[in-house]
Amino acid sequence: MAESSNISVTGIGPVKPEQAAPLFLMRDPVIFPYSLTPLLVDEENLAALRQTMERDRLLAIFPELPGDEELGVLPLQVTLKLFNYREKRRSGVGILVRVVKELNFPDGSVRILVRGLKRIFCHAIETAGGVPSARYVICNESASENEDTENKARQKSAVAAFQELAGAMPGIPEELQVAVLNAESPGRLADLISDALNLNYAEKILLLSMTDVRRRF
């Protein structure tokens, strides 16, 4: 029988989670939708990886929160949704990822390449057979935001600022610059830029936790 530990996440209204994915425990990096990220799989996460590779290749990631000193760089009015699991504070807003590739090395280490899919809210953690899984709901962005004139102005300003930054920092990949220029969705644009910017860990967790697209610009 699965052992269930319900986690209350405030501010998201009534939820009826119908989806679950193996829980991948990690601190960093912060993964955003659309991004491709390599990860080292430690012993703690190996069972979760094996389980998902036999199914749909989906993993749920809720980043570990940094200490209070690092969180102190965030604006005072910010309140992060969080929960405690295995004596660690974790963000209540995480990311659903798909495993694109698994690589096994001669030294026994395992690395995976994952693609960020959607922001998700954690509703509960369940453990069955020693493998934790997260019950979650997908954070849906309001369609009206895509038609908002003010939001489109923010998009234009963000693209211009990113182009200026890319000109001063040659290390930004050309394919990322092309993706930013052609991003039709304000949410996708904000996430592409957030992933590319050299922000600290706490700031990236804050951006991941923002389900209102307008706040990300």
What are these language model-derived features?
Residues 2-217:
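N-terminal low-complexity, acidic/polar interaction/targeting segments
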